[in-house]
C-alpha cells in the first residue's frame, strides 16, 4: 500500500511483551507496552494532534491560511507541527523554557515558531484557551484508535491499562473504551510523586517531562480511573535508563514512570498471570540533553 499523507501513518503501533524485563524483575504478570514512538512524528501525541486538527477543520474553525496557536510541553507541539505542515497551516507554540532542547529543535524543524514561558510557572504559564487540556478531540483520538488497537491486538485479553497523565487524553480515552468493552479492566493513572494533584496532593516541580501538569486537566475523567500511582523522579529515571539495556528499547522519562508503575503493579500477587498494557509515549532520543542521560 502507498499512503497519500503522513496523517494516514498515525496509529497502528505495536505491542511488545517485555520478556527480558519480566525475567530480570521476577514478574509473574505480563508487562506489555504499546510503542508510541513509532508514530510518524515520534510520539503518542500524534494521535491527539491529528484528531484535534481534523475536528477543527470539520467544525469550520480552521481552513486555508489559518494559524494554529497552542501551549505544549513538547510532544503535542511536535505532533501538531507535523500535522500542520502536512495540512498547510502556520503553527506557533508556547512552552515552558524547562522543556528539552531537542523538543524545541524538532518544533522548528517542522517549520513551527516557538515562544518560551518561565519554567517556574510550569504548564500553567503556557496555557491559553481552547487548548489540548480541555479539547474533547484529545481523549476522542484514543477512544477511536488506541483503545480499539489494544483490544484487537490482545484479543480482548487486557486486564490492566497503565498510562502517565499529562493532558489526560490517553488515560481518559483508553479508559472509556476499554471499560465499555470490559468493565473489569483496571485503569491506572500515573503521576509524579512530587506533584500528586490527581490524588489530592499539592502541585510542585518535578523531573518527569510530559506528565504532571500541576493541575487537574479538564479532560481527566476520574470515573474511569481505578488507581492513581505516584512515581518518584528517581524511579522514573532509573526505569528509563535500565530498559534499553534489558530490551533494546529507548524510552523517555514519562515512559520510565509508566514502566516503574507497571512493574510494581506486576509484583502484586493478585495480578499474577494478568496482562498489563502500558503506554510508552515516546523515544529516549528526545531527552539526550536532560537529566535522563546526565553523567
Give residue spans per PLM region.
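PLP-dependent amino-acid enzyme catalytic core
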Residues: 1-295
Amino acid at each position: 500500500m502507498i499512503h497519500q499523507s503522513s496523517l494516514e501513518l498515525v496509529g497502528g503501533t505495536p505491542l511488545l511483551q517485555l520478556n527480558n524485563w519480566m525475567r530480570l524483575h521476577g514478574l509473574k504478570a505480563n508487562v506489555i507496552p504499546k510503542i508510541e514512538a513509532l508514530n510518524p512524528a515520534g510520539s503518542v501525541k500524534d494521535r491527539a494532534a491529528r484528531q484535534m486538527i481534523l475536528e477543527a477543520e470539520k467544525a469550520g474553525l480552521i481552513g486555508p491560511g489559518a494559524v494554529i496557536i497552542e501551549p505544549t510541553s513538547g510532544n503535542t507541539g511536535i505532533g501538531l507541527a507535523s500535522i500542520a505542515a502536512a495540512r498547510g497551516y502556520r503553527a506557533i507554540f508556547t512552552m515552558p523554557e524547562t522543556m528539552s532542547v531537542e523538543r524545541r529543535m524538532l518544533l522548528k524543524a517542522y517549520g513551527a515558531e516557538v515562544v518560551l514561558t518561565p519554567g517556574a510557572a510550569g504548564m500553567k504559564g503556557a496555557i491559553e484557551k481552547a487548548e489540548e487540556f480541555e479539547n474533547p478531540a484529545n481523549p476522542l483520538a484514543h477512544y477511536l484508535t488506541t483503545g480499539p488497537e489494544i483490544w484487537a491486538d490482545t484479543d480482548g485479553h487486557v486486564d490492566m491499562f497503565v498510562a502517565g497523565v499529562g493532558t489526560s487524553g490517553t488515560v481518559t480515552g483508553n479508559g472509556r473504551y476499554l471499560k465499555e468493552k470490559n468493565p473489569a479492566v483496571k485503569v491506572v493513572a500515573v503521576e509524579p510523586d512530587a506533584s500528586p494533584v490527581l490524588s489530592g496532593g499539592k502541585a510542585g516541580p518535578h523531573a518527569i517531562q510530559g506528565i504532571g501538569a500541576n493541575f487537574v486537566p479538564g479532560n481527566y475523567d476520574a470515573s474511569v480511573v481505578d488507581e492513581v500511582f505516584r512515581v518518584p523522579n528517581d524511579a522514573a529515571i532509573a526505569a528509563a535508563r535500565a530498559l534499553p539495556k534489558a530490551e533494546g528499547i529507548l524510552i523517555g522519562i514519562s515512559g520510565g514512570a509508566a514502566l516503574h508503575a507497571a512493574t510494581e503493579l506486576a509484583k502484586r500477587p493478585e495480578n499474577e498471570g494478568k496482562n498489563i498494557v502500558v503506554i510508552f509515549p515516546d523515544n529516549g532520543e528526545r531527552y539526550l540533553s536532560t537529566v535522563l542521560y546526565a553523567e
